[in-house]
């Protein structure tokens, strides 16, 4: 009963149709039930209503009823919105080039990439190389600049070397005015003269250190003891080899003897043992 009474609420039915009451279902006398106030939303009818119930016409609606039509006007089919194209989605494999509705799919290219490509083509003039192709050229230019920056060794003539050596023998260090005067006389730059004197001073210092080392070695060898022949009581001689360079260079003379003057080392070599 309750479900049937609830189903009767809603928009007023068509003319001549009574509300869903026991009398109307049992076929009682025609009587009109009080109408429900206008404006209440219609409830959906239950599926358990008897087949004897008469449903009002779908197209009829009270002029003052603003309740939504649950069944709606005659089923016109679902409304289809036009498909929204997605340019970022490419055409899947095995499908045609056009999507539903005859819309052509665009290749997989985001709008930002396409805009960037168009902007780059617009900014770069026709025939100009791309930035990627300029990098190897820049590297080659840097290599050439590095090769050009290498200092080349200055080749001096014999007259220039002689004049520089003479000046160096007189003075190891030159003042700025002397260096400028010497450079102008030799047709050289002050930098070249300065570099030559620096190299010459380094060479001179190396020569001094080598000569000093050689002198120290000679002095150490001169201080070594020299062994001479020794005479023992039994008149036996002990010969010790002595270098000839360390023997006395001057001859020895014996007074009152007729022996010719002989150096000591010659006498030493002629002795019999």
UniProtKB/Swiss-Prot annotation:
Tell me its family.
Answer: Belongs to the HMX homeobox family.
- For this protein, the DNA-binding region equals 149-208
Biological role: Transcription factor involved in specification of neuronal cell types and which is required for inner ear and hypothalamus development.
Q: Which GO terms describe its molecular function?
A: DNA-binding transcription factor activity, RNA polymerase II-specific; RNA polymerase II transcription regulatory region sequence-specific DNA binding; sequence-specific double-stranded DNA binding
Basic and acidic residues: compositionally biased ranges: 114-123
Indicate the principal place this protein occupies in or around the cell. Answer: nucleus
| Protein name per the record | Homeobox protein HMX2
Listed Gly residues bias regions: 93-102
For region Disordered, the annotated ranges are: 1-152
Source organism superkingdom: Eukaryota
Keyword field: Developmental protein, Differentiation, DNA-binding, Homeobox, Neurogenesis, Nucleus, Transcription, Transcription regulation
């Amino acid at each position: 009963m309750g479900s049937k009474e609830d189903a009767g609420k809603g928009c007023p039915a068509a003319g001549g149709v009574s509300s869903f009451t026991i009398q109307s279902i049992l076929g009682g006398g025609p009587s009109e039930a009080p109408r429900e106030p206008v404006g209440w939303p219609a409830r959906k009818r239950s599926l358990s209503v008897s087949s004897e119930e008469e449903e009002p016409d779908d197209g009829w609606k009270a002029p003052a009823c603003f309740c939504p039509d649950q069944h709606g006007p005659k089923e016109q089919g679902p409304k289809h919105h036009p498909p929204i194209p997605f340019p970022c989605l490419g055409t899947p494999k095995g499908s045609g080039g056009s999507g539903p509705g005859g819309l052509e799919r665009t290749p997989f290219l985001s709008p930002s990439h396409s805009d960037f490509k168009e902007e780059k083509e617009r900014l770069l003039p026709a025939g100009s190389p791309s930035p990627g192709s300029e990098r190897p050229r820049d590297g080659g230019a840097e290599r050439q600049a590095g090769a050009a920056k290498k200092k080349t060794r200055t080749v001096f003539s014999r007259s220039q070397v002689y004049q520089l050596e003479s000046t160096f023998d007189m003075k190891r260090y030159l003042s700025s005015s002397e260096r400028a005067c010497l450079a102008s006389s030799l047709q050289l730059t002050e930098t070249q003269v300065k570099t030559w004197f620096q190299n010459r001073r380094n060479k001179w210092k190396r020569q001094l250190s080598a000569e000093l080392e050689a002198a120290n070695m000679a002095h150490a060898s001169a201080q070594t003891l020299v062994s001479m022949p020794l005479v023992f009581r039994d008149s036996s001689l002990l010969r010790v080899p002595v270098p000839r360079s360390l023997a006395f260079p001057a001859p020895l003379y014996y007074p009152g003897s007729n022996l010719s003057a002989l150096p000591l080392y010659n006498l030493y070599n002629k002795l019999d043992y």
